[in-house]
Design a protein with these regions (language model features):
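Active-site-proximal alpha-helical segments within enzyme catalytic domains
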Residues: 87, 216-234
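Active-site-adjacent helix/loop patches that line small-molecule binding or acyl-intermediate pockets
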Residues: 2-40, 93-209
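Active-site SXXK
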Residues: 66-67, 80-103, 225
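Cytosolic covalent-transfer regions centered on His/Cys nucleophiles
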Residues: 78, 206-207, 213, 217, ...
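Conserved active-site-proximal loop/helix segments of enzymes involved in bacterial cell-wall
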Residues: 233-254
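Short, Gly/Ser/Thr-enriched beta-strand-loop segments that form substrate-interacting elements
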Residues: 255-278
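Short Gly/Pro-enriched turn/cap motifs at secondary-structure boundaries
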Residues: 50-53, 128-130, 180, 271-276
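A short, well-structured edge-of-sheet supersecondary motif
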Residues: 36-72
Length: 278
């Protein structure tokens, strides 16, 4: 459930009456103080190197569409973007190719299944259903323009950098660790190839997808990227348009319906905002 302070911000945002900078800063500080000692859950270990993350890291970053920054805690500590990259690659591919192509080749419906499931592919004639699950993200990455894998990768890296407002770089250790542990993604790509949902080399596509997930970001970067979508595709820091307002809207709609995987409905009911799990 949303706390009282968060609910106050949400209600003001929904009605167009934005809270003051001081109120936002005080609220973030209070949230950080209140929850920094929470130690439920475990550090992710499905990729070996992720298990090395410090569970005490906790940072909050909020950036307004005008570019005003509100931060507290470990907002400047770098980590790999992982599945959050899916939303922004979806937007970039829609901008470069067309939303209609992605809709036809991938889909926009929630699978109701775990993020790395093969069932959705098998049950829907090879259509992975949406770009937020692994199969759909791999199929979306395959649609990125580029005559070579290197060119496709650079288009993704540079595009995500435009969203972040700075040049993002690959975390080589994360990439190497993930490449050793992503047999399931390779299997998903092979299955998509068998249904002709991807026509590029499946292993090259998984390599590019793994690279995009291994880009190093901070909470600040993600706040800038999210604010770019919220402001209709315009980066609040650089003031540069990254994608059209229509594609920003479509991306937010997909995040609302599919961004939290099989729990997206519950998240939307309880929180009411687009989001993406990492």
């Amino acid at each position: 459930m949303v706390g009282a302070e968060g609910e106050a911000i949400r209600q003001q945002a929904f009605t167009g009456r934005l809270p003051s900078d001081g109120f936002i800063d005080a609220t973030l500080d209070d949230i950080h103080r209140r929850y920094r000692g929470l130690d439920d859950g475990e550090v992710a270990d499905y990729i070996p190197i992720l298990a090395e993350a410090d569970p005490d890291w906790f940072g909050l970053s909020l950036i307004e569409s005008a570019g005003t920054v509100h931060e507290t805690g470990d907002a400047d500590i770098a980590f790999s973007i992982q599945s959050i990259s899916k939303a922004f690659v979806f937007a970039l591919v829609c901008q470069a190719r067309s939303t209609e192509l992605v809709h036809e080749r991938v889909g926009v419906n929630n699978t109701g299944l775990p993020f790395n499931s093969v069932m959705a592919i098998e049950l829907n004639d090879g259509k992975p259903l949406n770009s937020m699950v692994n199969a759909g993200a791999i199929a979306t990455t395959a649609l990125m323009p580029g005559s070579t894998p290197a060119e496709k990768w650079e288009n993704i890296r540079s595009g995500l950098s435009l969203f972040a407002g700075r040049q993002l770089s690959l975390d080589g250790r994360v990439y190497a660790s993930e490449m050793e542990a992503n047999q399931r993604n390779k299997a998903l790509a092979r299955l998509l190839e068998s249904y002709e949902r991807i026509i590029t080399d499946p292993l090259d596509t998984v390599d590019i997808y793994t690279r995009q997930c291994s880009l190093s970001v901070t909470a600040h970067d993600l706040a800038v990227m999210g604010a770019t979508l919220a402001d209709g595709g315009i980066n609040p820091v650089t003031r540069r348009r990254v994608v059209s307002a229509e594609i920003a809207r479509d991306t937010l709609a997909l995040l609302a319906s599919c961004g939290m995987y099989e729990n997206s409905g519950e998240w939307l009911f309880e929180i009411g905002l687009p989001a993406k799990s990492g």
